[in-house]
């Protein structure tokens, strides 16, 4: 005989596989939807540098695959690739694609080839405060939306380096921001987003997003 607690656990797991989260849940964990995206931005205010790293873990009819990206400014550098490997962690924030991209809440390791590498650890993280909902507010609890969004890391300092073209950037002390987006079918037809950090007040960070979101 199946115990009531087992029925409840199955029901909650099925609910979360739609992409939704109950109030006070943890939206950082993978949901098992078609796309789980992870994004980091590093801002070195003192040296006038910025870079981003991203991984999108996708679930297709032939199995998981991932899109990977690394970009830098002011030296123009952009590397984007796709791989047949991809994993999003259902127990905590974490994603990987073989040895090309390995990341969790405290580190990001990217190796997309010569001139496109990143290795950082996060110190003094400033996480999203414990609250009823994440960045998508009450829409987190609505099942089967095509897009959810959550800025889980509002600030912190990094230790590490980046290989940008023929340069090696020292990133110790730079600021970091991290977010996650997920949904049943990738990005909506319309989506806009912005994020800023590197202010004189190192605790200040701004992020916003919006788009055409549908359910079903």
Protein language model annotation of sequence segments:
Residues 1-216:
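Structured soluble/peripheral alpha/beta segments that form catalytic or ligand/cofactor-binding pockets
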């Amino acid at each position: 005989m199946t115990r009531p607690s087992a029925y409840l656990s199955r029901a909650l797991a099925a609910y979360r596989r739609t992409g939704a989260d109950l109030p006070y849940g943890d939206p950082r964990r993978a949901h098992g939807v078609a796309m789980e995206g992870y994004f980091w931005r590093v801002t070195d205010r003192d040296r006038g540098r910025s870079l981003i790293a991203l991984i999108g873990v996708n679930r297709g009819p032939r199995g998981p695959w991932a899109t990977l990206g690394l970009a830098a400014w002011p030296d123009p550098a952009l590397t984007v690739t796709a791989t047949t490997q991809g994993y999003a962690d259902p127990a905590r924030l974490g994603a990987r694609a073989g040895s090309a991209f390995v990341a969790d809440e405290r580190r990001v390791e990217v190796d997309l080839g010569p001139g496109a590498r990143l290795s950082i650890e996060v110190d003094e993280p400033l996480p999203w405060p414990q609250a009823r909902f994440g960045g998508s507010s009450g829409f987190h609890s609505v099942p089967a939306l095509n897009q959810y969004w959550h800025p889980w890391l509002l600030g912190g300092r990094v230790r590490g380096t980046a290989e940008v073209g023929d340069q090696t950037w020292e990133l110790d002390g730079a600021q970091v921001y991290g977010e996650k987006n997920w949904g049943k079918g990738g990005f909506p037809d319309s989506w806009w987003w912005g994020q800023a950090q590197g202010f004189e007040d190192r605790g200040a960070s701004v992020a916003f997003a919006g788009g055409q979101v549908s359910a079903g």
